[in-house]
């Protein structure tokens, strides 16, 4: 009880701090209302229990409250072990699915906490900010943060649905993917969201033909973004260099669905060794985005699918100029032996300009080199409710970072590019299938 009360007191303090920030937000500001292309939802416990057939309720995703036996995060890998009832150890809420036991952690939902209080520890739903999982509370927290609209990546399914891709029962996994997408569209982004929450759906990654069907099913109800892996081979899946993904990519091309890749969507964060502390991986979180972008630029897919767009959530943007320079040099000087002469017929930087978007929330270097990236290729994010989030001061952070830029450039970065890419209304709202 003491632990729960302590956390509740902290939440109250965070709310008071947020109210102070809200008062500051009421001061007139020329900074545009933010459209964040990378926030996160923590799925409520009922998502799959309400939507799966009854025969799967005891095997599909469900939550239990249990103690933590041990948890490590080294070498880019997260390894929690759930204890038995009565065991010593901090108690948290866990998702259980087949053999998987995955706890809710403070890193999943850290907003409202001082940096030194954010640790790798298990928590319960009561110990997180309600805006993590509740639509009405989320909109209130967005108001505090000068955010109008937000695209949200998943938590329990992981950033591109790896949880279901790794499952043994593929029939159940497909039902889980569809149930998540139905919840995302009908509830999370439903009427209560008033167009301010933008749907991002999952696909059955193990079957590109089923993936194409799911893209089209969701596009028919207005969805324009789908989660995908930065580096599919890390998940035991084909790379983008072959033709295995073409049915899925064709569906995205035809429907205007953006392929959205979040750091960590390869189920491993960049690191250097098994014993490297988390700080090493945290410093180089962009690395898989970098590798992935080169894959796409050298794959020829943007020429084969001319309407295809991809975006990198939380990858930041400062690394992009040199990679484009290097890719152009390799294409110009080495394409004969480099294996791309027959598929890439223009400089990679030209393909980037028409097809790739970088996303950032804290990248002063990238903003100083915006001319080498392209104003039209940059999107803004707040990463609520993760530990890196700029909530509740995303406006102030943005003003500090972009104060040197013309107002029309700031407008494009903070709103305009997202409106165009995601097919939002001129006011920055999601219309659904209307």
Task: Identify the residue ranges that each predicted region occupies.
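Substrate-binding cleft and catalytic face of glycoside hydrolase catalytic domains
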Residues: 151-166, 190-198, 211
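Short glycine-enriched loops at secondary-structure junctions
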Residues: 153-158, 263-268, 384-387
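Extreme N-terminal basic, low-complexity initiation segments
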Residues: 2-6
